[in-house]
């Protein structure tokens, strides 16, 4: 059997979410998903009823649709996928002269 090397290892999502559930509740729900090793949620803007959040998820064989399902079931929506990584190892961004 061929080893799976195309699996998703990291997702960075820009998400608009309601104030309820809290990020503490949402991070726990996301962390319970199959293949998830860690989740970080940072709020970068708060409005009267919503929060803009950066959600970083790392693991092995992440299931994008299941992750989006958890976010949507809790009233959120994914605005964009800001980073995605796959393969046997995670490659960090390297600063170049253009940066």
Regions of interest found by a model, annotated:
Residues 1-99:
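Long, contiguous binding/interaction regions
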